[in-house]
């Protein structure tokens, strides 16, 4: 199965918080999108691996994602080495995405930066034909995505470009709210975390609104990229 976009997140909810509006918009345009979570988020202060799996499944259904998988790397302790790279290479070759989305290059949670570099390195290595992989006993062809884009998360990283998600902010927040174990709940007895603070979800909306303000729209999501972005014409710029 070939996908147009394959989004990776170190934890379930990373992709939704960083790029769900963009994903919803691309799906509305007929693009196929998949999400692969690197870990189950089992070290998270709130919820559990089982609960987060259920929440990820709900978010998948809300967004209309084609596939969602979890590589079950060790939360907090996965590293950028050959074994982990090979698992991601197999997925890239299986789904042959044109575009890969992944974690912010630098962020509060150490897994985000680690995951970002791991996925980026795997995208490059996946294009080398002398690295051999198989799927169900059949050799996989080398495949390198055209581009890797990093969504912005906790830190206020200056984006290289932004995507207008006006009209898709509700879809984004519905997908985010699928992860109810992670966010503010006045009835919860679990410890408070930076994202379970009662003001956190408002900050997600405020950031999208501020990025939208920069381009004269209601809402936007920001991304950084590893090469200079190009447009076919000056008139393609908003």
List each model region and its residues:
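Metal-dependent de-N-acetylase/amidase catalytic core
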Residues: 2-6, 82-238
């Amino acid at each position: 199965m070939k996908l147009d976009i394959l989004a990776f997140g170190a934890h379930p909810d990373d992709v939704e918080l960083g790029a769900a509006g963009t994903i919803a918009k691309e799906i509305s345009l007929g693009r196929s999108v998949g999400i692969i979570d690197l870990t189950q988020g089992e070290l998270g202060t709130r919820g559990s691996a089982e609960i987060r799996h259920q929440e990820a499944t709900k978010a998948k259904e809300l967004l209309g994602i084609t596939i969602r998988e979890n590589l079950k790397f060790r939360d907090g302790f996965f590293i950028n080495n050959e074994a982990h790279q090979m698992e991601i290479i197999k997925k890239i070759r299986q789904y042959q995405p044109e575009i890969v989305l992944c974690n912010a290059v630098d962020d509060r949670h150490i897994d985000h930066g680690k995951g970002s570099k791991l996925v980026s390195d795997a995208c490059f290595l996946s294009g080398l034909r002398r690295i051999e992989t198989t799927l169900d006993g059949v050799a996989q062809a080398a495949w390198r995505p055209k581009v890797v884009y990093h969504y912005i998360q906790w830190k206020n990283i200056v984006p290289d470009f932004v995507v207008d998600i006006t009209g898709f902010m509700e879809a984004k927040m519905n997908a985010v709210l699928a992860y109810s174990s992670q966010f503010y709940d006045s009835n919860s007895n679990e410890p408070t975390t930076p994202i379970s603070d009662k003001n956190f979800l408002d900050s997600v909306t405020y950031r999208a609104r501020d990025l939208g303000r920069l381009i004269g729209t209601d809402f936007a999501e920001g991304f950084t990229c590893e090469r200079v972005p190009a447009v076919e014409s000056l008139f393609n710029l908003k």
